[in-house]
């Protein structure tokens, strides 16, 4: 069974540069055997809420930005 990962990122951080690398990041995790769920933050404390939501549903949580 494939492992699941949620990747939470702030699209406004770093002048939005992560958007250009997002597919490369996902590819790295896919090659590591992870199914990747991508979530962009929309408001203050959104990353915290996303972590709470996925804490029991995925094998790994990665946050950026």
For the regions a language model picked out, list residue spans one by one:
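ATP/NTP phosphate-donor binding region
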Residues: 1-64
């Amino acid at each position: 069974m494939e492992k699941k990962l949620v990747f939470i990122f702030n699209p406004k951080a770093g002048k939005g540069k992560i958007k250009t690398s997002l597919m490369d990041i996902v590819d790295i995790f896919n090659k590591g055997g992870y199914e990747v769920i991508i979530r962009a933050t929309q408001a203050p404390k959104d990353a915290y809420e996303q972590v709470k939501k996925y804490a029991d549903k995925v094998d790994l949580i990665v946050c950026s930005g």
